[in-house]
Amino acid sequence: RLERTTKQLREDKKKLEASEIELRDAKERAEEANQLKSAFVSNMSHEIRTPLNAIVGFSSLLINSVEPSEELQEYANIIQTNSNLLLQLISDVLDVSRLESGKLQFNYEWCELVTHCQNMITLTNRNKTTNADVRLQMPKEPYMLYTDPLRLQQIIINLLNNALKFTPAGGSITLDYTVDKEKQCILFSVTDTGTGIPEDKQELVFQRFEKLNEFVQGTGLGLAICKLTIQYMGGDIWIDKDYKGGARFIFSHPIKERESTEK
């Protein structure tokens, strides 16, 4: 009986070793495939972006060189709008690829939050194409946050622009934040009075290329990039299911004491 048990153990050991080798090989193949995918995405994005930049540039020249009433200007505007949309898609695809591969750079520094958010609201209001009111609702006293200002701006402007797509003229979009010292995080919220998000779609909106409305322009990657970036920064993002007056996106961002980062 002891001999049979020993033999069985040896066979089991061989199977485990074979399985370990297979798993290692599979892991190496997956990593190689992921590297090839990232290289392909990067190369293709570069190859597509170069001619698109030329199209955008020449369409701008066309717009500025013809009379506003001319039919040609309308066509030039269409070319420029759709070219910019394609450039945004390329940029978004590259961001997703870099986030997944851990190659997107983050540069942390102390940032005065109220001023930073006010600048985002000003930028959004300047570029918006609807008459919805975009406003800031947060404490007026300065607050220093240790963050990557550029990535934080990308997240918030993505959320504000997303809200603008679904908020009619006369509606409002509000950016707010609260500090939760107990959980050592800051909670940002972007609240709109738009069409809202059906409950069965709320978990899907953070998936890549998921669009609530196929007739609304966009790449379908903005919210996916927000989620990946926020998670990379140590936070999370979700939809407030209790808010019924439109849509409310909330995301968390870790906070640090200033002394702890300066040591």
Where are the regions a protein language model picked out?
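Short alpha-helical segment of the dimerization/phosphotransfer core of two-component systems
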Residues: 81-86
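Short conserved segments within the C-terminal catalytic ATPase subdomain
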Residues: 127-136
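Short conserved segment of the HATPase_c
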Residues: 57, 197-209
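Short alpha-helical Gxxx[C/S/T] motif in the catalytic ATP-binding
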Residues: 222, 226
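Helix-loop junction within the histidine kinase core
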Residues: 97-108
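Primarily the dimerization/phosphotransfer
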Residues: 18-64
